[in-house]
Amino acid sequence: MSESLKIIFAGTPDFSACHLQHLLSHRQKILGVFTQPDRPAGRGKKLAFSPVKILATQHHIPVYQPHSLGLKEEQQSILDLDADVMVVVAYGLLLPQAVLNMPRLGCINVHPSLLPRWRGAAPIQRAIWAGDQETGVTIMQMDSGLDTGNMLYKTVYPIQPDDTGASLQAKLAALGSQDLLLTLKKMAEGKMHGETQDEQKTTYAHKLTKKEARLDWLLPAAHLERCVRAFNPWPVSYFIINEQIIKVWEAQAMPDSQQVSHLQPGTVLKADKNGIQILTSEGVLNMTKFQLPGKKIISAWDFLNSRNEWFQIGKQLLS
């Protein structure tokens, strides 16, 4: 394998840690790890290590946590490591051109989409949200643009009808880890050649927001179902009733019937152990798993046992 390559790894969340673990499991030479500074987390707001820092510390790998890489002083540690390549996976900091030029073979990035589709911050979730039938992983040679570099390795992966943001991320992390190792092997052998991206096919995966997670009954049920799946585990789709935010963790789109054509979107059609059914502009959304503020996730049946009066047949929910 590519044991001869000296690697700097840059990443922060669980998705990144999966890739680092795979490299370590295959005895890759990791000179150092760059990750985001420790952040307050949890109810106590105590400083917490990133998943990548936790893993690196367990393996006694030097950890660097600059707030930016814009100054020469901050870049010196990369230069001092004298790496062959820098592997970047969901790091969260911009890499200036000076940094991109430092490793002998430059910097490569693992991006969980089929570039140039879904460049940007939330490619996994946007693929589900848009109703894509497939996605994948692209490993690219980094340049100064946003996910615009030449593609080194690309693998297609089907999106299942029940995939969520969480489940698809786990699948693509496993796929990306394998592809990364293959890419490094080919780079070490001098057999890797890049392919330019087709700018005409570019789409952008903008950051997710809590505002867009609110369910709008004026949209089709099929789209709302995709939102529920895409926004799991964050920011989580929700609706508001009696001034309370109710998160929806699971829902299915269903066809409506002729008998409801006179009703307005947002109308409660049915509420039982199988779910709470709400009419939309096109079809019915059957919601089956919920979470009240500060509470655990519960089934529709448990929700109705405590809040049945909220979902009387014919009641109108606000968008």
Curated annotation (Swiss-Prot):
Gene3D superfamilies: Formyl transferase, C-terminal domain, Formyl transferase, N-terminal domain. This is Methionyl-tRNA formyltransferase. PANTHER family: METHIONYL-TRNA FORMYLTRANSFERASE, METHIONYL-TRNA FORMYLTRANSFERASE, MITOCHONDRIAL. Its EC number is 2.1.2.9. Belongs to the Fmt family. Signal peptide: none annotated. NCBIfam families: fmt (TIGR00460). SUPFAM superfamilies: FMT C-terminal domain-like (SSF50486), Formyltransferase (SSF53328). Attaches a formyl group to the free amino group of methionyl-tRNA(fMet). The formyl group appears to play a dual role in the initiator identity of N-formylmethionyl-tRNA by promoting its recognition by IF2 and preventing the misappropriation of this tRNA by the elongation apparatus. It comes from Hamiltonella defensa subsp. Acyrthosiphon pisum (strain 5AT). It catalyses: L-methionyl-tRNA(fMet) + (6R)-10-formyltetrahydrofolate = N-formyl-L-methionyl-tRNA(fMet) + (6S)-5,6,7,8-tetrahydrofolate + H(+). Pfam families: Formyl_trans_C, Formyl_trans_N. It comes from the Bacteria. The lineage of its organism: Bacteria, Pseudomonadati, Pseudomonadota, Gammaproteobacteria, Enterobacterales. GO terms for molecular function: methionyl-tRNA formyltransferase activity. (6S)-5,6,7,8-tetrahydrofolate binds at S113, L114, L115, P116. Keywords: Protein biosynthesis, Transferase. GO terms for cellular component: cytosol.
